[in-house]
Amino acid sequence: MTNLRKTHPLMKIINSSFIDLPAPSNISSWWNFGSLLGICLIIQILTGLFLAMHYTSDTMTAFSSVTHICRDVNYGWLIRYLHANGASMFFICLFLHVGRGLYYGSYMYLETWNIGVLLLFAVMATAFMGYVLPWGQMSFWGATVITNLLSAIPYIGSDLVEWIWGGFSVDKATLTRFFAFHFILPFIIAALAGVHLLFLHETGSNNPSGLCSDADKIPFHPYYTIKDILGVLLLILVLTSLVLFSPDLLGDPDNYTLANPLNTPPHIKPEWYFLFAYAILRSIPNKLGGVLALVLSILVLAVVPFLHTSKQRSMMFRPFSQCLFWILVADLLTLTWIGGQPVEHPFIIIGQLASILYFLLILVIMPITSLFENNLLKW
């Protein structure tokens, strides 16, 4: 009798994706983040579902409903902080996953990479709208400032902003629609993640060497299932430690104050995972220019495959490109730090220099260095 997992219409899909999938024998722990992102998404959808059961998307009661969840609902505080810090873990895994893709040349799988960029935008949009829902000071002013950026779009800008707000300011209509979108988007993200995997399994995984691994494949189960379980346990350890010991470490104290349209917080800033893009936005004095730079800071990832000039796929054997990659990482950390600082000297000039370096590295310096490395090998 043939094995059921190989014949059953549903089970054979799972089998070919997670059990009998031929995987390269040398993929490192940097390849764990895909499964970790899947776990993060599941955690976010489940905790979000339970939060939505008690949350009310009305400006009068949103803040108190979140307080009610934390005080009166059984383990409501745990669900709320798992959801809030789960978002941070999600973004940590996302950034490491994208960084892995850049380092090892995984972006050469064009369809997979482009769906990934789309996923990044979708997750960022979801996180932004989720941050507005508790209706604290930073929720309200963050929503006001970020949505207002769309008014920089010529001709249709101001109409577009009022259309998104559902009125002349961020109010009840805005909160209700943000809740609706925040609820539906994770399911769209899950569907996109399925497409992401579909395209990945068309080509098979890349590996650290960047070389073709067709001659040396091993089954996904048990080797990488066990490896992924270790990653998941470590993720849960970090997440639960964060939630149970310092749940507010990554949050903003201003969000414990009810939203007040008449009182602007001294420093409006988004969650830590948006600070690098926020720093790029602020580094340009022109409003439209800042918005374009903000979008391009993520969209530039879609251009990376077309700027690949090296004859080797991975950076494993390219020391100069490796140095530039780690300079890029340091630059992004600098931008993240700058995004959380007030707009004053010397932070303004540091932010501007870091923003210029960010785009220069990706668009100019790294492709030229790759050409230089080709010549170095006399290829």
From Swiss-Prot:
The further comment given in this record reads: Heme 1 (or BL or b562) is low-potential and absorbs at about 562 nm, and heme 2 (or BH or b566) is high-potential and absorbs at about 566 nm.
Native species of this protein? Sorex shinto
Binding, heme b b562 = 83, 182
Q: Which family does it belong to?
A: Belongs to the cytochrome b family.
Sorted alphabetically, the Gene Ontology BP terms of this entry are: mitochondrial electron transport, ubiquinol to cytochrome c
Q: How many cofactor units bind, and how?
A: Binds 2 heme b groups non-covalently.
Domain of life of the native organism:
Eukaryota
The upper taxonomy is: Eukaryota, Metazoa, Chordata, Craniata, Vertebrata
Alphabetically, the GO molecular function entries are: metal ion binding; ubiquinol-cytochrome-c reductase activity
Q: Where in the cell is it found?
A: Mitochondrion inner membrane
Q: How does it sit in the membrane?
A: Multi-pass membrane protein
- The residues that hold a ubiquinone are 201
The cofactors required by this protein are: heme b
Q: By what name is this protein known?
A: Cytochrome b
